[in-house]
Amino acid sequence: MKLYTKPGACSLADHIVLRWSCLPFELTVVDAATMKSPDYLRLNPAGAVPLLVVDQWALTQNAAILNYIADTAPLTGLGGDGTARSRAEINRWIAFVNADLHPTFKPLFGSTAYLQEDALIQRSHEDARTKLRTLYTRVDAHLQGRNWLAGDTHTGADAYLFVTLRWAHKAGVDLSGLSALDAFFQRMLADADVQAALQAEGLN
């Protein structure tokens, strides 16, 4: 099993979960140029991460990879407690991060550079930060009295949320007063496997 990851990208979530799973895997850290190379594009025509290769099978998309890892390591609790409700809760939060939080960062990652006017670009950045504050406030409310997003142990949803929180801190998103969210972030930072994943990707 080989995971292709780009430092600090959303693929960090899959990297963390692979370490939580204790499954044997090989890590390949790639850059933007590598992701556009013919060899990489044969595996993932989107030219993006994450990419998980198992034997001759290439799997993309965070939600798919996180669920695959959970199913491949069923005794870890990464897929919940075995009930349909537990798994649905995990996937509800993976979907929230993937469909609501993650895309809201796009202006902050340069998607509005085409506007070519500093004032308009800045406005798009501020709008993104405002929307992200609203979304993270919802997560903070859910985390009150909880350690993890879904159930009694960490899952792929938590790893994915953590990755976006790293982005939020770097992008200047206002997270002040969101105490449960901050406690979650510190809990993740203290995790030995999270630290190992960050170190392996050259992150601090």
From Swiss-Prot:
GO terms, molecular function: glutathione transferase activity
Domain of life of the native organism: Bacteria
Cytoplasm is among the record's keywords: yes
Gene Ontology cellular-component annotations: cytoplasm
Keywords assigned by UniProt, alphabetized: Cytoplasm, Transferase
Class of enzymatic activity (EC top level): transferase
UniProt cross-references to PROSITE patterns, sorted A to Z: GST_CTER, GST_NTER
Subcellular location, principal: cytoplasm
Domain GST N-terminal positions: 1-77
Binding sites annotated in the UniProt record for glutathione: 10, 49, 61-62, 102
The protein's Enzyme Commission number: 2.5.1.18
Pfam families (UniProt xref): GST_C (PF00043), GST_N_2 (PF13409)
Catalytic activity: RX + glutathione = an S-substituted glutathione + a halide anion + H(+)
InterPro entries hit by this protein: Glutathione-S-Trfase_C-like (IPR010987), Glutathione-S-Trfase_C_sf (IPR036282), Glutathione_S-Trfase (IPR040079), Glutathione_S-Trfase_N (IPR004045), GST_C (IPR004046), Thioredoxin-like_sf (IPR036249)
Subcellular location field: Cytoplasm
Family, per entry: Belongs to the GST superfamily.
Subunit and partners: Homodimer.
Function statement: Conjugation of reduced glutathione to a wide number of exogenous and endogenous hydrophobic electrophiles.
Name by which UniProt lists this protein: Glutathione S-transferase GST-4.5
Species in which this protein is naturally found: Xanthomonas campestris pv. campestris (strain ATCC 33913 / DSM 3586 / NCPPB 528 / LMG 568 / P 25)
Native organism taxonomy: Bacteria, Pseudomonadati, Pseudomonadota, Gammaproteobacteria, Lysobacterales
Gene for this chain: gst
